[in-house]
Swiss-Prot record:
InterPro entries: QueA, QueA_dom1, QueA_dom2, QueA_sf. It catalyses: 7-aminomethyl-7-carbaguanosine(34) in tRNA + S-adenosyl-L-methionine = epoxyqueuosine(34) in tRNA + adenine + L-methionine + 2 H(+). Its main location: cytoplasm. Its EC number is 2.4.99.17. Belongs to the QueA family. GO terms for molecular function: S-adenosylmethionine:tRNA ribosyltransferase-isomerase activity. It is found in: Cytoplasm. Keywords: Cytoplasm, Queuosine biosynthesis, S-adenosyl-L-methionine, Transferase. It is an enzyme of class 2 (transferase). The gene is queA. This is S-adenosylmethionine:tRNA ribosyltransferase-isomerase. Monomer.
Amino acid sequence: MRVSDFSFDLPEALIARYPKAERTASRLMTLNGNSGAITDGVFTDIVAQLNSGDLLVFNNTRVIPARMFGQKASGGKIEVLVERVIDQNTALAHIRASKSPKVGNELFLGNEDSDVKVKATMVARHGALFELKFNSDESVLTILDKIGHMPLPPYIDRPDEDSDKERYQTVYNEKPGAVAAPTAGLHFDEALLERIKAKGVELAFVTLHVGAGTFQPVKVDEIADHIMHAEYVEVSDEVVAQIAKTKAAGGRVVAVGTTSVRSLESAAKAALDKNKPLSAFYGDTDIFITPGCQFQIIDALVTNFHLSESTLLMLVSAFSGYDHIMSAYQHAISQEYRFFSYGDAMFLTKQELIKQDTP
């Protein structure tokens, strides 16, 4: 398949630049992966979509304030986006500058209106990423909490605000490390989670630290030629046991967000590659899910609306069928659903592989 097969035109007005006042106030489109039937509703309808005995799997990563501004020793302005924290004093980062820093160059980071300035040294380059060593007694995460900005996606196209520190974060976040939110989870508040649990639905938590690569455009013509960026994943023994218990009792595994899908399916792929049953998985994944892929664990999916020609649009097309997804997106545009990170959501059921449709 070609990347252009996943293209659609989106009116600018449908890009959500701010969240709804209430987390649960978004709309919810339900798509049946087998029939293609679409139902329009509100996000709290998800309670009715879930059954007692289902397992709802969330990504508990915490978004770090990964964007920093500053200058080089020469005075040139720079923008730094931390991609991954390596240790207490070291991070890999993307750097925007008129001229890229060289090994040994010092960077001075901090807001113009603040007295807090931190010095970092560029110690190595790894492809598009720069390895920075922070010259401070404080950890990288502490430094980011002091001078960092929430790394809003480029399509939100506005400076971050104080409200984003709460709203570009799930209510159940636990493990810091992401530079983008697992956005399907933004629709849940504590009250909705309690309603879901009261129905007999069990909750499980995996970790995938979302990297900035999630926003990188696919730069090849054929999707088979695309190389995915790697992200760190944790799927615990406890989650593996919850999945086994759910499947044995006839329940469904429902992933909240494509990051939860990629976490669980990465663990399943690792087990399959070893010809062993599902087990805990800790490590990097570069899994790329496209139409024709067979899902080992996931039965249903909660997800936001994704960018044209993105790997995430390819993933949901693999899950619910290419034709069904592309038709659903046209329906969403005609009904003026809000798109992307702060936008509305979908509840998708899986299309059986024998009915998989690809162009």
